[in-house]
Amino acid sequence: GLRDALYDAGLVADNRLAVAGASMGGMTALGIMTHHPEVRSVACLMGSGYFTSLAKTLFPPQDLTEMTARLADWEVTRALPRVADRPLLLWHGDADDVVPPDGTFRLQQALKREGLDGNLTCLWESGVRHRITPAALEATVAFFRQHL
């Protein structure tokens, strides 16, 4: 798979494998974190850990039950301890008009409530819609510099 190709190409130094993504890519990065402990840190920009509930607002209702059932195994909120044991960056604009920021807030609060927020960095950018800002990119680079 992709992981093996990265290692084979010599793109992973000292087993320092990390994943970052924005929007759906951020959700994918969170899902990867639930199943791949070899990933040392993850940055999720304007994504959501609540895949099944977000899917209900983004997709037409016709095949929703089957689709959300497949997403459930990857949902971060069902695997909080597995994502809390490594550095995690959550970044979201508080005016996001595509992926509601409440999913990021709920994940942040769930980790705090369970006492699992020791490796969490959660950054909010005021007035930002569904866009990646220069500040978000700078924060992501700084995060990986610190945690890789």
What is each PLM-predicted segment?
Residues 2-63:
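Primarily recognizes the serine-hydrolase "nucleophile elbow" in alpha/beta-hydrolase
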Residues 23, 94, 128:
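Residue-level signal for short, function-critical loop segments
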Residues 17, 88, 120-121:
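Short, conserved active-site loop motifs that form the nucleotide-linked donor/cofactor pocket
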